[in-house]
């Protein structure tokens, strides 16, 4: 059993830039080496690059409205209370819609495998849905 104090002790919140478009802030909750849990705040229009997780990823939307899209073409508009599961190694991206922020809790299984930046045309098409 492991009881976490609600965030990783001694690790500050950080602004993420290298694999995100727009302003994104992350607050580390738990890192066991196998499972990483973060609270992530996306400002309007901000989103991840394409990425995947060898053990899959669970997202729980806690504020605002967002988008989750996969390489297979699935696009979902999500809101508070929605839960998203991406299968192991499923390439996807997620972030806020253009008119609102989105906050989610991300439970990632295994090391994130980062890919290319999401094309602006792809983000715009998904956001319009």
Tell me the role of every PLM-derived stretch:
Residues 1-35, 113-129:
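A short, N-terminal "cap"/entry segment at the start of jelly-roll beta-barrel domains
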Residues 36-53, 88:
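Conserved short histidine dyad/triad with adjacent acidic residue
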Residues 41-43, 52-68, 107-110:
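Short, conserved beta-strand element in jelly-roll/cupin
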Residues 46, 54-55, 74, 90, ...:
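A generic "binding-loop/recognition-motif" signal
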Residues 48-50, 68-69, 86, 91-98:
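Short beta-strand His + acidic residue motifs that chelate non-heme Fe in jelly-roll/DSBH
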Residues 72-88:
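Short acidic-glycine-tyrosine-enriched beta hairpin
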Residues 85, 99-117:
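A short hydrophobic beta-strand segment most commonly corresponding to one strand
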């Amino acid at each position: 059993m492991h009881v976490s104090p609600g965030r990783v002790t001694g690790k500050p919140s950080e602004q993420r830039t290298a694999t995100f478009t727009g302003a994104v802030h992350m607050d580390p909750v738990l890192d066991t080496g196998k499972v990483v849990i973060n609270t992530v705040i996306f400002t309007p229009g901000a989103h991840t690059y394409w990425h995947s997780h060898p053990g899959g990823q669970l997202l729980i939307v806690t504020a605002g409205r967002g988008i989750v899209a996969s390489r297979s073409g699935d696009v979902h508009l999500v809101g508070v209370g929605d839960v998203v599961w991406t299968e192991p190694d499923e390439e996807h991206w997620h972030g806020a819609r253009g008119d609102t922020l989105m906050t989610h809790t991300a439970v990632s299984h295994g090391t994130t495998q980062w890919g290319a930046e999401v094309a602006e045309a792809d983000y715009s098409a998904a956001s319009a849905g």
